[in-house]
Amino acid sequence: MKIRSICFLAAVVQLLPLATSYANAAGESGVASVYSTESGGRTASGAQLNPGALTAAHRSFPFGSRVRVTNRRNGRSVVVTVNDRGPFVRGRIIDVTPAAAQALGFSGLTQVTVERE
């Protein structure tokens, strides 16, 4: 019984990244928000927070990932580079810089689709 449990756990550990990457490739929908630039500090990747850059915070995409964010309300989209972690507010799936929000045509919050490029 113990060996079966170990084999099952090993299989799950090996297959979980595949399931996650498939889900990420298929895209996710939810709420996007605009970064607060008041702190003016560094991102989780160590980069300086630049409000004029097309960057974003995502909970699970690796740093350096390029993702297409599409505003579901107006159809506008932009490709951003993930260089931070977040958002840490329930129901939100991505934080974008003010420059990315401007390109997407929103301020505050909006419904988006996020897909890896």
Predicted segments — roles?
Residues 2-117:
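Secreted/periplasmic proteins
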